[in-house]
Amino acid sequence: MKRVRTEQIQMAVSCYLKRRQYVDSDGPLKQGLRLSQTAEEMAANLTVQSESGCANIVSAAPCQAEPQQYEVQFGRLRNFLTDSDSQHSHEVMPLLYPLFVYLHLNLVQNSPKSTVESFYSRFHGMFLQNASQKDVIEQLQTTQTIQDILSNFKLRAFLDNKYVVRLQEDSYNYLIRYLQSDNNTALCKVLTLHIHLDVQPAKRTDYQLYASGSSSRSENNGLEPPDMPSPILQNEAALEVLQESIKRVKDGPPSLTTICFYAFYNTEQLLNTAEISPDSKLLAAGFDNSCIKLWSLRSKKLKSEPHQVDVSRIHLACDILEEEDDEDDNAGTEMKILRGHCGPVYSTRFLADSSGLLSCSEDMSIRYWDLGSFTNTVLYQGHAYPVWDLDISPYSLYFASGSHDRTARLWSFDRTYPLRIYAGHLADVDCVKFHPNSNYLATGSTDKTVRLWSAQQGNSVRLFTGHRGPVLSLAFSPNGKYLASAGEDQRLKLWDLASGTLYKELRGHTDNITSLTFSPDSGLIASASMDNSVRVWDIRNTYCSAPADGSSSELVGVYTGQMSNVLSVQFMACNLLLVTGITQENQEH
């Protein structure tokens, strides 16, 4: 009853202060409104309080000590342990070896060579008597750079894993008292970041058994089970074999990619483009007769959601309305036709969540299609000539277009006019592609160049030259390091974005390259060509000599079939390669 009365008073005061227009009047009161707590919350708070505090941490923050202090603090700890006759000192002595190794590695990374040599020459002798430690100590002598550490398996294992040291609870408290007695920031940093102290609780006396209330003498006769030795946490031999196996798999040739081919048969109108949605549920194709066709790739049929206005069914007052059978519409269809353009459709792009579709056409317009109602909801205009290509930025914030008017343009979905115009090419902009971070836009042109633009500033930051024909396709690696370009010169060029230079040139196709895509791990790139083939390249390493047909040695697979034209290739997240193309049935005469 008293609690309810207190809450009523607080609410009354809060209402009064609000009426008087005091700013944030209920802020202090809200802090005291919680007067009850569940049993689970109380138990969690007690656990946090018991497990936190100075007794359970070595250092609250890894402070940075001067390199000269490494030698001073380590020498002080060594002298403290060797000069003491306490049993705790003998138990803490094994901690000196990992401390020495980690301090030496830190000095190699952050200090001059003279400081490293002074630290090593002063303390390394105390560890040479132990055969297991001697090997690592001798390897430290030849370690001078971070590259030396990374190339050494045992030293790299120290950085990749925490060294485990077991201490009794009394010895652990003994060590903590020493660390708190003086300036030992370098030691605290190593203990916090690189060493795991496995503290073994001290055995309780008979008096502690009774006082704790957690057990009784009748149950265990005052005896605790003996400590069972736990298995070795770090088996160097097994760890070395495992990491060597991982390295062989990573550096070895990749496994062949699984391909799923979607073929178009007997297209009455010329098929210009085809694309599969990111969720692999829809296939969109643009035709010369200005229509876009959508197919469902799943067993579920395409069904239109109800929309407010249907312009194809506007009734006048004089019309005689008859009941229509909408059973077919409710059941859905396997294909939908989107009409709205008045010229050939050259490119289509799905949004990242597959909720919408963008298309561009010879009619100089870009249209947005709602894939819920399968209707055209937005018309974007700004180009003065046909629009050849589209691309949507990651997370579907912006989209870009390339046109016959020699410009690329940046758009947002909520505005029907372009936000940026990228001018600089001397001929048509045939393809556009966003960088994975959305800050850059790449464009390929008929003028045989590739340009990289700052999406926000609108200026050109890279110019890549070397193609001998129009550039028809672009692709960024998912890690953002490389840009691939290809076109009518039948060569695939890989550019290093950081240096702005050519990284690799891949040869093998015998006709125009029309589509490029990177694998999710940026290790493979697939290319589609009008020579009716799909080729997969491993851009990381070269494993064998060049094939007999003159292709580059990076080629790992060639896929051909009954195709007259391959339209696009798309890598999915599961490393599945989706291919779309046109297949004509053989006719016997």
Swiss-Prot record:
Its main location: nucleus. Residues 211-221 have a biased composition (Polar residues). One of its GO terms (molecular function) is transcription coactivator activity. Keywords: Nucleus, Repeat, Transcription, Transcription regulation, WD repeat. Residues 211-230 are annotated as: Disordered. WD repeats lie at residues 266-305, 340-379, 382-421, 424-463, 466-505, 508-547. GO terms for biological process: positive regulation of DNA-templated transcription; regulation of DNA repair; regulation of DNA-templated transcription; regulation of RNA splicing; regulation of somatic stem cell population maintenance; regulation of transcription by RNA polymerase II; transcription by RNA polymerase II. It comes from the Eukaryota. It is found in: Nucleus. This is TAF5-like RNA polymerase II p300/CBP-associated factor-associated factor 65 kDa subunit 5L.
